[in-house]
Each structure stands twice: as structure tokens, then as C-alpha cells.
Amino acid sequence: MTAARTPLHARTVPLDYGPDALEFDGSPTVLFDRPGLTLVGWGTALLVPARDAAAALAAIPCDDAVNVLGSGPVALGALPFTDAFDGHVVVPRFTMGTSRDADGVTRRWATAVGPADIALPDTGELFDAVIWQYGTTPAEPAPAASAADLTTAMDSAGYAAMVADAVRAMAQPEATLRKVVLSRPVEVHLGGALSLAAALRRLRAGEPNCTIFSMPVPAGTFFGASPELLVARHGTKVSSHPLAGTVPRGDTARTDADAQRDLAGSTKNRAEHRYVVDAIAAGLGPFCEELSVPTEPSVVAFRSVAHLGTRLEGRLGARPVGVLELLRPLHPTPAVGGTPRPEALSFIAGHEAGERGHWAGPVGWVGAGGDGEWMIGIRSAQLDANGTTLRLRAGGGVVADSDPDAEAAEANVKLATVLDAVVPGASVQLR
């Protein structure tokens, strides 16, 4: 028998000023920070399985004096790669939001969620409650933790061998597998406790065009800098921006331009990318009365790598559909699983070292009206509850003409991107 939840209510008020959440002396409970929108929450008003989030939010009446994207009660979380909707999301006790539109207009607000029989604070009280309960002192620059030991259940040579196995499997006459995304894990034991807020600041400084996130998961915190939008719903507008097909950035302007030009013209990378675009279009199509799917990808460059990317945009039909319902048929896309999905997931289960956990699972937020944004949880790490052990994973898409050594090198570049942002210099231990 499931105990009835305590009835909740919520209040959202405008703010004239909002401090940077990453400058507090303590880490927030949840963080979703992309160019144009920041949601940061403290405390837990409700912890609910993702499959029940829409109904739980709809049951929270809210006095919302702001009424913009992300205001009102929201649920945020990181969902596991496998059985994503069994994962949990958090409705924070206090949420501070900032939005910046295309015209440069900034809106700030705070939302409180609490038991329905207890009065919620007004504007000044709400702001003070957040500041005084969760930290008032700007964080001092924290010394970076050192990597005392780096271990892995699969080194680069083992990863290359796994890629070679996949290529051979695709070459069999009866093979139906066309693409599989493979990854390898790394575990870092730190010489001292990691300052999560400092690590997030370094990630944001290094990848300003990514979504910086930090979410509680069982036995720790899952955080990172995701470059890839799985799905967003803003009113009737739907969008997705998959990335697939990758090259390392060049060391000079010329070599970088050459690498990006080669990526744009690569038959192998374009085919790998198209599998993802077609799968997302097929998943979103039944919900949309209009869906724009560009025929040509663009090159999207980040600090260490460049990807092929395609932005899909659509308009929902008459039936109301929340972002979590849109998410369900999409995950895992061929960008993190493969195609056909059953064959790819079977190969992953039989060949990868260890469980993926939350790596490459959906990370994001959903509001009471069904709006929300979900990224793919790559370029990420999980920090244990003591703050002394990091677990990372990275990899890439494998198709019939993939080169195992090149794929192993690409995986190392992706691992190093996160490692060196979180624990500067740790990537020298990668093997």
C-alpha cells in the first residue's frame, strides 16, 4: 500500500536580483544552466518517479506572478540510461530561475513549494529563505582536487578491440546491426574531497555553449556539461538538436578548419548522423502537425571536439503532449545506443565493461504545464557521497567502416575534456 502524498502548494514571485548559484558557499540540490535559462534548486519538497512527474506537478496549485518558461513548480533530475522512467526527479523546496530572451531581456524569479497547510513566504521572505538557509558567502576559489589514482576496467586497447568486434559483427552476411555506440569507464580516486561548485564553474568556463547540470542520484551526484538537446517543449513548439559524427579540434586555425571540413564531407560520419536524425524524426512525427527536418547537417564546435548537428523543429498537434511523453519514444537515440535499437542494446550489454548508470541518460526539467528541456547526459561524471571518487564514461558511434584505433583516440579526447575540467591534469593518467 502506497502512502498518500502530503498536499503541496507553490508560489512564484519576481526578483530584481538573483545571485549566481555557483558562487554560493554550498552546492545546490539541482542545477540546470544553459545559455538563456538557469534553474537552480535547494532542498526537496517532493521526490517522485519520472513516470509520475507530470501528474505530481499538476496536483500542486501555484500562485505564479511571473508566468514565463520555467516558472512555477518544476521537477529536475537525471534519469538512468536503462529503464529511464524508473528514475526519480526532484521538486525543489526553493527554486531560483533566470531567463534571457533573444532581445536581451532578463527575468528573475523564485518559487517556493511546501505543505498546503503552511503559508508560503512573500517576495522578500522567499529570497531571504534561500540566501540564509543555503549560503550567503560567495565561494572562495577552491583548490582543484588531485587525482591520486585513476583506474579503468577497459583501457584504450581494450576499447579498440571492442570496436573491432562490433565492426566484424556488422560485416556478417546476416547482420542487421548498422550502428552501435560503445563506451568505456574510468574511475578516479581523488587526493581530497572535490568542491562540486568549483568543478561546475570550471565546466561552465570551458564549455559556455553547453548545458551545465548537477543532479542527485543514488549514492552521489551526477553532473556535467551536455552539448546535446534530446527534446524540448515550449508551449506548442518542439525541438531537438542531435549530435553524431565527431572529430577532435585542430591545434591551429588551419588544422581545425581542415578537420571540420573533413567532418562535413565524411560519408561515414554523415551516415552515422543520419541514423540519429531519422530516428528522432520518426519519434516526434506522430505528435506534430508540422516537423522541419533539414536535409544537411551543420558542424557544431566545442572546446575539444566538433560534431555534425541537425536542429529539428516542430509544432504539436491538437492533443496536449508533455515533454516527458515526447521523451519516451526517443530514448535511447542512435546517438547513444545505436540502430536498430534492440540489436545495439544487446551488443552493448554483452561487450561494455560495467553498467552505464546515468551516463547518456536524459537530464533536464519538466514544468507543471508540460514544458521542459531534456539533454543527453554525456560529458559527465558521477561523484560519490564523500566527494572523493569520480566515475566517468565516454565513447562514440561505431559503424561498418569505423577504425578501431581512431575510435579509441576519440573516446580518450572526450574523457579528457571532462577529466581535465574537473581534475586539471588528470588525463595524463589515461591509458
What are these regions (language model features)?
Residues 25, 66-69, 204-208, 352:
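Soluble sensory domains of the PAS superfamily and closely related sensory modules
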Residues 2-137, 156, 216-230, 371, ...:
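Cofactor- and metal-binding active-site motifs of prokaryotic enzymes
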Residues 1-15, 34-52, 101, 116-157, ...:
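Contiguous alpha-helical scaffold segments within structured protein domains
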Residues 35-49, 83-94, 103-104, 184-271, ...:
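An anion-binding catalytic pocket shared by soluble metabolic enzymes
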Residues 28-30, 76-79, 180, 212-215, ...:
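A short glycine-rich, hydrophobically flanked beta-strand micro-motif that places a catalytic Asp/Glu
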Residues 311-431:
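Conserved hydrophobic core element of enzyme catalytic domains
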